[in-house]
Design a protein with these regions (language model features):
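A short linear hydrophobic-aromatic micro-motif
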Residues: 46-47, 96
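Conserved protein kinase catalytic/activation segment
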Residues: 56-58
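ATP-dependent carboxylate/phosphate-activation module, predominantly the ATP-grasp catalytic core
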Residues: 1-41, 45, 52, 64-89
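Peripheral (often C-terminal) accessory segments that flank ATP-dependent C-N-forming ligase machineries
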Residues: 83-131
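Pre-DFG segment of protein kinase catalytic domains
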Residues: 60-62
Length: 131
């Protein structure tokens, strides 16, 4: 495991997806992820999602074979995971990322785009829109 950031969700959509979260200091999910990915002989980005119960027990909920959707939070916390992945893929020497800043927060937002119907037709016909 060359890099890992633990994020706690605290804003969820009705489908359980995080729209806000915070980096936390908790080595247990990192240890569990390391064990799981080693057992799978996994190479490449991955996200292991755990549920922690009130007794402090962790339950694996899912494994995603990609970077997490909150990847920018990892970078804000001090780990550039895509760069690390490229360096590993290119057989470049890397120093495992073993620390990050706890207390970094992300909030996902949505922005509306207003277009004229002609612009939609232009996009459909040409693949681009001139604004």
């Amino acid at each position: 495991l060359s890099g890992a950031v633990v994020m706690k969700k605290f804003g969820l959509t009705p489908k359980g997806k995080a729209f806000s979260g915070i980096t936390v200091e908790d080595d247990k999910p990192v240890q569990l992820t390391r064990q799981i990915l080693k057992s799978l002989k996994w190479i490449g980005p991955a996200e292991c999602e755990f549920l922690k119960d009130e007794k402090g027990h962790y339950f694996l909920m899912e494994i995603n074979s990609r970077f997490p959707s909150w990847l920018y939070l990892a970078a804000a916390a001090g780990q550039n995971l895509p760069l690390l992945t490229v360096q590993l893929a290119c057989d470049m020497p890397v120093r495992p990322l073993t620390s990050y800043t706890a207390g970094k927060l992300f909030v996902r937002t949505v922005a509306d785009a207003l277009l004229d119907a002609r612009q939609i037709m232009e996009l459909t016909a040409s693949g681009e829109v001139r604004l």
